[in-house]
Amino acid sequence: LFHCHVWVVDCICAIFYNIGSRMDPNLKQRIIEEAYRLFITKGMKQTSFCDVAVAVHKSKGAVIHYFPSKKKLIDAVVRMRFFPDSQISCEMYSLADKDWNEFLRQYRNPIERVINSFPKHLNGNLLVCYMQFVSSAHEYMDEFPQMYQQLLVREQDFLSNVAYDHKISLKDAKAFSRQALNTSIGKTFLRMFSEI
């Protein structure tokens, strides 16, 4: 009798879950968005499936349906939010070709681009949040350091190409790109220390 009762409850839960998930075709993306916000504000270690479920107004089972483990959820957040937010926008690519001075004025390094994509209502030192996110992603994802290194290499290559296209000698272009990236990252960290 007990097994029958459990089976009935499981069936009822499955029916309500399927009805609920049909009503929200964007649930997987919402889970990723809310998990990202929670990972930034609370930290990856401190964020539970229950926290994410509450944030998306669904059951823990609904979250686990899409992401059976915390590692898979973190992987999705890093690949679908963090790294896309780190990329150079199409507008910056075209601006580099059109208006060099404006490009130099508007250029933001990958750290600043990610921080600028954070939800607007976050409080506190966002650079510290960024650093904690990166540190935790490094712990949870074996391939994260390589992915992050590739991001920085692409960034420096982009800056080298932009500098070369603007008739800076190849040696100077490499030096410029390295200096531009290092300087902008350095400025980001200096701002962090001035906020402490």
Where are these regions (language model features)?
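Short, basic, alpha-helical segments at the C-terminal edge of helix-turn-helix-like DNA-binding modules
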Residues: 79-86
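N-terminal intrinsically disordered/low-complexity leader segments
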Residues: 1-26
